[in-house]
């Protein structure tokens, strides 16, 4: 692939730029470590990935509801009931999830050469809070699930990003950690992509539903991504 043609890099946000596994576990642990129970992190994360994908594949729900319902369904399957208030409190925790340590340096470096965009399975108000944690980096546009009323891997989210960019697909590179949500649909649409294969903080598949997409490139950190595209386009 000739990186010289790339004008825009779009990013998945949660799991790629934001450390969602540590973020969600911080608020899920009190719900599942009680009454003598201690549900393993691997089980919590894998159930999260499975249930979230099920909810997102049905009729559109705001992500706030997806998060709350996911927590409640995990509790139901673990015989540890989660109230609607506890589910809502877990949803609110997203605003506290923090960027990975390499996120801001990599984005700032990439922004010197490329336009940057976001394609995220999230509500607008949630991303508005996350955006503050990514300052001073500026994004040309942000496509949320709320705006298009669908969740990745729906092609609509990516098609809207292409439309807003004003570019052809061969001028866009998409970077993400989820094969299921991002790499597979990017491939189907002919958008070059980089799999940011961040190892899960726990053994197993982590919080993203397993997928089979074959990436154009693979890196393990955003620092590697920055080095890859910067050296190739120098």
Q: Where in this protein do the model-derived segments appear?
A:
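N-terminal helical cap/lid subdomain that shapes the substrate entry/recognition surface
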Residues: 3-101, 112, 127
């Amino acid at each position: 692939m000739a990186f010289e043609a790339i004008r825009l890099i779009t990013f998945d946000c949660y799991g790629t730029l934001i450390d969602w596994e540590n973020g969600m576990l911080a608020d899920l642990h009190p719900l599942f470590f009680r009454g003598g129970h201690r549900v393993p992190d691997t089980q919590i994360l894998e159930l999260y990935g499975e249930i979230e994908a099920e909810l997102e594949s049905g009729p559109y729900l705001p992500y706030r509801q997806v998060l709350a319902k996911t927590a409640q369904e995990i509790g139901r399957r673990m015989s540890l009931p989660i109230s609607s208030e506890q589910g809502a409190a877990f949803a609110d925790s997203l605003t506290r999830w923090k960027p990975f340590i390499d996120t801001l340096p990599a984005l700032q470096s990439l922004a010197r050469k490329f336009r940057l965009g976001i394609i995220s399975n999230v509500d607008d108000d949630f991303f508005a809070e996350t955006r503050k944690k990514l300052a001073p980096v500026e994004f040309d546009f942000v496509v949320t699930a709320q705006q298009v009323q669908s969740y990745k891997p729906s092609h609509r989210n990516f098609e809207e990003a292409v439309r807003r960019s004003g570019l052809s697909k061969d001028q866009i590179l998409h970077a993400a950690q989820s094969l299921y949500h991002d790499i597979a649909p990017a491939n189907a649409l002919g958008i070059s992509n980089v799999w940011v294969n961040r190892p899960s903080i726990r053994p197993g598949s982590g919080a993203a539903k397993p997928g089979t997409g074959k990436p154009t490139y693979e890196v393990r950190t955003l620092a590697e991504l920055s080095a890859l595209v910067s050296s190739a386009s120098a």
